[in-house]
Amino acid sequence: MADSQTATSAPEFKSAHFIGIGGAGMSGIALVLHERGYAVTGSDLKTSRYIRQLTRAGVKVHVGHEAATIDEVKPDVVVVSTAIPESNPELVRARELGIPVWPRAKMLSALGHGYTTVAVAGTHGKTTTSSMCATMLDRMGLDPSFLIGGIVEGYDTNGKNGSGDYFVAEADESDSSFLFLNPNVVIVTNVEADHLDHYSGIEEIEATFAKFMSLVGEDGTVIVCGEDPHLVELAKSTGRHVLSYGFAESNDIVCMHPDVKGIQSDFIVRFEDGTEHAVEIKSNPGRHNMLNATAVLTVAHVLGLDIDAAAKALSSFEGVRRRFTHVGDIDGITVVDDYGHHPTEIKATLAAASSLGYKHVDVVFQPHRYSRLQALCDDFADAFANADKLLLIDVFSAGEMPIPGVTSKMLADTVRAKHPDKEVVYCSSRLELNQELEQMVGEGDLLLTMGAGDVTTVGPEFIEYLTAKKDA
């Protein structure tokens, strides 16, 4: 476990070593720290897109974890994620040498010192919403710094050190580490049961989110989605200034007159003073993304920015990689990849996909974590209502040990039991999957790959499979 003191001031060290630097969150923090002139090194078990990004920027990354690495780089501080066990040889050596060990979120908090910090949290939607916020501020010429758990399209990075006064941070609730942050404005998109490997249940999750919302202080603002009235009540229980947003007239900021044109969404946002502003989102379809955009415009409102200029800037948002990302087309089949790995995310994405006019919406889903599948199996089974065909591949463990009986085949059986008319296939190998897809998916269909694991490779592999057969 990392040292527990909260970071409330700018970093006073000169060098930092990141154990597990290849993750989406860790790599962004390391990149921004490097861009600010600190000496940054890191290590991870294997190379990745994020590590290649860091290497190009000039960060030295060791592949593999060895105690000797700590002796070599002699960092002033070591940064770890909760995925790093106490037995990690680099962590053990750092402790032996008395080097301070910081959790990822403490370093994130330190990087936000001296900035107006906007922190975006929620069970779903936080990566897209924080990316929208960073894009809006940047396209308004405000040059924000940002740290986000995904690659922001148009910037090709998950972290950026800007010269402006604003700092946008995706706040991770998965291990309560977002409690290290010191935000001025908070967005909470939703609160649901998830990460039950860390939390005892929804009550503990809600209590932790309430603590997080309290971090803004009495002069801050908490922006919450009013589609869940209980979330609004939870936010107001903190005694902080709360603004709710949503489609219902009861909200402080109202999303009105939604008009979906393919993947483009047009709508109106009305503020408390009655002023109305037209908004256009050219990527990331669906009502849930209209809500995300409304939350971001509310940030502009709270910061005293010109709302029409903010809406125009927001219209240039190009999306986030692995959030309804177009992979390619082959034989009249459109292939899209999406990170959705929780039932609510899946429902929202499929609702958006079903409105796009494809002949069929066919899904390849890879459950992420045995604990999540065990806790939410029935919810997963119901989440695929808008999928015409469902293909399941083996669980991506994310480092968890298997739980006896908790498998993708179990989920397939549950879907069949609850929805007998649904076409469901479990595939035990990628070859079997490609063969099934070849038979099941046709011209005019949307093939949607979903999950937080390596299911992202399914789309490109299927395109290569069909291309090779055509060229043979």
Where are the regions that the model predicts?
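Short beta-strand "acidic-cap" motif of Rossmann-like dinucleotide-binding folds
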Residues: 39-44, 145-146, 244
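Short acidic/histidine-rich motifs immediately flanking catalytic phosphotransfer sites
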Residues: 72-77, 165, 442-445
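Conserved hydrophobic helix-helix packing surfaces used for dimerization/oligomerization
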Residues: 15-18, 78, 118, 144, ...
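N-terminal leader/targeting and accessory segments in enzymes
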Residues: 1-103, 107, 229, 254-257, ...
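Adenine nucleotide phosphate-binding catalytic loops in nucleotide-utilizing enzymes
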Residues: 11-15, 19, 54, 199-206, ...
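Active-site beta-alpha connecting loops in nucleotide-dependent enzymes
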Residues: 12-29, 39-45, 320, 344, ...
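Glycine-centered, small-residue-biased loops immediately flanking beta-strands
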Residues: 220, 388, 445
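Phosphate-binding loop of NTP-binding sites
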Residues: 8, 32-35, 55, 69-70, ...
